[in-house]
């Protein structure tokens, strides 16, 4: 039987930016765990509505948007 892994706590709904001056994005749900233990999280670009997958470790390094 496959092991069930609970996704980490993700700040869903928070608005963050890619680095200090990058575009803003809204944090979505955890999608899947990667082989290195990191997680992919769905993010939605505030300006365009486009969605993308983003590593959780990068998400926690990004500042909250101003």
Report the location of each language-model feature:
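Intrinsically disordered, low-complexity, charged/polar segments
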Residues: 45-66
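Short aromatic-glycine-enriched beta-strand elements
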Residues: 37-42
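Mixed-charge, Lys/Arg-rich low-complexity intrinsically disordered regions
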Residues: 1-14
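Short acidic/polar mixed-charge low-complexity motifs
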Residues: 21-24, 48-50
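Short beta-strand-centered aromatic/proline hotspots
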Residues: 23-32
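A short beta-strand micro-motif
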Residues: 11-19, 43
């Amino acid at each position: 039987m496959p092991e069930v892994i609970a996704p980490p706590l993700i700040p869903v709904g928070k608005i963050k930016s890619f680095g200090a001056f990058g575009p803003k994005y809204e944090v979505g749900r955890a999608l899947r765990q990667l082989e290195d233990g990191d997680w992919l999280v769905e993010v939605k670009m505030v300006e365009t509505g486009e969605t993308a997958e983003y590593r959780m470790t990068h998400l926690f390094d990004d500042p909250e948007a101003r």
